[in-house]
Amino acid sequence: MSKQRKKADLATVLRKSWYHLRLSVRHPTRVPTWDAIVLTAASPEQAELYDWQLRRAKRMGRIASSTVTLAVPDPDGKRIGSGAATLNAIYALARHYEKLGFDLGPEMEVANGACKWVRFISAKHVLMLHAGGDSKRVPWANPMGKVFLPLPYLAADDPDGPVPLLFDHILAIASCARQAFQDQGGLFIMTGDVLPCFDAFKMTLPEDAASIVTVPITLDIASNHGVIVTSKSESLAESYTVSLVNDLLQKPTVEDLVKKDAILHDGRTLLDTGIISARGRAWSDLVALGCSCQPMILELIGSKKEMSLYEDLVAAWVPSRHDWLRTRPLGELLVNSLGRQKMYSYCTYDLQFLHFGTSSEVLDHLSGDASGIVGRRHLCSIPATTVSDIAASSVILSSEIAPGVSIGEDSLIYDSTVSGAVQIGSQSIVVGIHIPSEDLGTPESFRFMLPDRHCLWEVPLVGHKGRVIVYCGLHDNPKNSIHKDGTFCGKPLEKVLFDLGIEESDLWSSYVAQDRCLWNAKLFPILTYSEMLKLASWLMGLDDSRNKEKIKLWRSSQRVSLEELHGSINFPEMCNGSSNHQADLAGGIAKACMNYGMLGRNLSQLCHEILQKESLGLEICKNFLDQCPKFQEQNSKILPKSRAYQVEVDLLRACGDEAKAIELEHKVWGAVAEETASAVRYGFREHLLESSGKSHSENHISHPDRVFQPRRTKVELPVRVDFVGGWSDTPPWSLERAGYVLNMAITLEGSLPIGTIIETTNQMGISIQDDAGNELHIEDPISIKTPFEVNDPFRLVKSALLVTGIVQENFVDSTGLAIKTWANVPRGSGLGTSSILAAAVVKGLLQISNGDESNENIARLVLVLEQLMGTGGGWQDQIGGLYPGIKFTSSFPGIPMRLQVVPLLASPQLISELEQRLLVVFTGQVRLAHQVLHKVVTRYLQRDNLLISSIKRLTELAKSGREALMNCEVDEVGDIMSEAWRLHQELDPYCSNEFVDKLFEFSQPYSSGFKLVGAGGGGFSLILAKDAEKAKELRQRLEEHAEFDVKVYNWSICI
């Protein structure tokens, strides 16, 4: 596989996974999510940090509110091994549920391994991440926990959102694996220092068994890792295979692999990825063991032994390993408790393994194949290029950089404040540093420099007011002995000490020679900030090495080692400092947006971050709220009122004033209606509100004939189905940005289903009748006024009378009108029925009054009509019904808004193929478009970046769909429909439901693509079959299937 292909695959897998994660968090009843997420930690203090991070993830929408989260430390901070930690975590989860009030009876104590508790936990779907321990090779990540290090993949998709972390991406990948468990409870285990990029949607897990994810790997890599030996059922033609596990090997030689028959026919072997699952009975057995594991763990601690997950615990599911396992600590118990079930290998051939085991690997993942999806600037404050020197390839996240700073290529700066007179080299990592400019003096007196390939970070310590500054070389391995390749800042540690005049006894008083290494060297002084920076320069070899003053200061100072630091981190202080720092950054960005910008940022999201400062944050939000009237006044000519009002609504909510926010929302929607009217017909608002008979409309009837003349008009129109592009036609998007929609006019069951008959009558007033038997006679047409009642069945016709000017222009002074309407399609169809019926009525009224009945004029008037009705909506429905055939329509903002309809000259072959392969299916699910529409428009007015990027993508797909249809590439149209459907669910997860999901899942083997038409939520669906035969087969299966009470309609393109 080429590097280019890998990069594309990584982006595709991550985007799909993130889409699914967001969907499962926003609508967990429809898209199942984890019942519990559990992290293992090395100590109670680290567990507190992880709990804080888990709360953050919930607050940021990474974890569903219904999911139980828990961080579980090793007992008393003693190392017990990953296998025992797994059992301990299961026990802790059961106890946690007990504390949450899940009372299963007075005699039911978890510690007794009670059957009811085992049954209760066994029904749960649990994600477990092993994230405990120290990270000697990525020491700067120890304070935050390596699993929470920053990984800004796809960060640009949501520039006002939090910086994505490795943990967030792991959650995204894992969210797709949840479907493999279906309704059977289970456990899914991952490790905290690896991001396994693969399409977990495809994952298959055998029932009542354990499984391990594997990937084919070359023998040289396999020799340093775990290898899985399976039964010979691999078929490399498939993207994955499921096979019974026969044996487990640890760091095998080539001879071992040959002897155990572990080499595949292509010369590779199966790597153990560390992703393990247990489902059904295998999970129940594990829960039963976990609920009664405490005596076993005490025995391990007493004997100072460990139980590994990857060697010991999984061996219980592999019969060939049982004899070996019985020789291990508690091995007999594992075999007896778990050995009844089997383990399978789920081998996925396209898995990419991003390992974060060293600092250099972290930087590699930001500058290598994946660099195209890396957000290099996120939630940061950066000076102008004329007063700083910051490399374009550097990654700056949640940081404030002052003028006068220099940052080299491919460096990572995270959660820091870097003041002037600081120079950071290339390929360096700076984390949690807050350099106060007043401590540095002038650049002439002292300029701090961090050389190339170095790491620099700060740690708050328990029992100390200040922080300690820590540093090392990017490639230093703190585990290496001083006498065996041990380095500091990239140089041999022995030589560094000799050059500086430091004795080994200064660093190690209680360690024997072979155990002396950077990890346990008491190297880092705790002094004032400026003293620590100056000594850092000296220790890194940037200063006079034999400076007596500095070595004296260093020797006399209290010093700590990396090891001691790891056990003394003040986690609450660190979390609080990080929250305040990010709140300050968000506040600065929001302030700049209001003072210098046009409210282009998502202030709702930024305020969410600002409020982490609690009372201080609330004051900041109140100050922003106070600025709103002045801001609106200054920018009234160029800032849409709808956006200005929405900002005020968001700030009222941030300040806790929900009542005022709800009250102001009416102004938001009023402004959208007003802006729409202004854009589609210049001067329309004045025309609508004018009480005199004088008209400013194009449809002005200058001399209405007072003598009654009988006239009758009948308008019949098709319905529309949309392939892609919907939402880009909807105000206020279409008033501010270009919109593109690809749709098609069709007949149903051989007829045009939507129509109206309008005729003049001798009886004064207006009579309205619909196909539901509702009738109304309006004696005085001037009495028709907005707003209309939501449940008024005649508000569509009343709005049509207003927008066409029939009432205002005295047309009904000399004649009465009888209006009859019908729509022979199910209610809530999604076929644009309401808009197309409105178009039919508007067209009929303009015909009978000699108005401008051009399709473009009608389309614009219907836009205004829908705003008057309060339903909102865009132009694509009326365009779809008014213009025949398949068309690609563009809209361009302006006053008036410009519409450009381009009919696609479809060949007879294309028409025939579409009519044979495309199924138009009524789902039977009633939908209300305005409910979906309200949510989507609100998110757009908030400048929700994920929504904006989704609609932009829909417009790009509309252009691609046009090309595909013109080239008769119908399969590609199916792919486009399916991606459009995913994006629609990104816009609003409630645009689908479980029934629709099941319908599409059932149709998947027969189809190239599918989607609900219109805004979704129910109504009609389009299913593009793989070919004509598959279409016939699917139609028959759907009509016969008892679970699906759906109707497949006969249709044809309305030419």
Curated annotation (Swiss-Prot):
Q: Where is this region: L-fucokinase?
A: 693-1055
**Tissue-level expression:** Ubiquitous. Highest expression in flower buds.
Entry's Gene Ontology BP terms: GDP-L-fucose salvage
Note on cofactor: The L-fucokinase activity absolutely requires divalent cations such as Mn(2+) and Mg(2+). The GDP-fucose pyrophosphorylase activity also requires divalent cations, with a high preference for Mg(2+).
- Give the span(s) annotated as GDP-fucose pyrophosphorylase: 34-565
- Presence of the UniProt keyword Transmembrane in the record: no
Q: Which residues bind ATP?
A: 826-836
Q: What happens when the gene is disrupted?
A: No visible phenotype and no alteration of the sugar composition of cell wall polysaccharides, but accumulation of free L-fucose.
Any single GO molecular-function term of the entry would be:
fucose-1-phosphate guanylyltransferase activity
Temperature and function: what does the record say? Optimum temperature is 40 degrees Celsius for the L-fucokinase activity and 30-45 degrees Celsius for the GDP-fucose pyrophosphorylase activity.
| Effect caused by changing residue 830 to A | 90% reduction of the L-fucokinase activity, but no effect on the GDP-fucose pyrophosphorylase activity. Total loss of both activities
Activity versus pH, per record? Optimum pH is 10.5 for the L-fucokinase activity and 6.5-8 for the GDP-fucose pyrophosphorylase activity.
Query: Which InterPro entries does the record associate with it?
Result: GDP_fucose_pyrophosphorylase (IPR012887), GHMP_Kinase-Related (IPR052203), GHMP_kinase_C_dom (IPR013750), GHMP_kinase_C_sf (IPR036554), GHMP_kinase_N_dom (IPR006204), Ribosomal_Su5_D2-typ_SF (IPR020568)
The free-text function statement in the UniProt record for this protein reads: Bifunctional enzyme involved in the salvage pathway which converts free L-fucose to GDP-L-fucose. Catalyzes two successive reactions, the ATP-dependent phosphorylation of L-fucose to L-fucose 1-phosphate, and its guanylylation to GDP-L-fucose. The sugar-1-kinase activity has a strict substrate specificity for L-fucose and ATP. The pyrophosphorylase activity has a strict substrate specificity for L-fucose 1-phosphate and GTP.
What family classification does the UniProt entry report for this protein? Belongs to the GHMP kinase family.
**Any idea what this protein is called?**
Bifunctional fucokinase/GDP-fucose pyrophosphorylase
According to its UniProt entry, this protein's organism is Arabidopsis thaliana
Its gene name is: FKGP
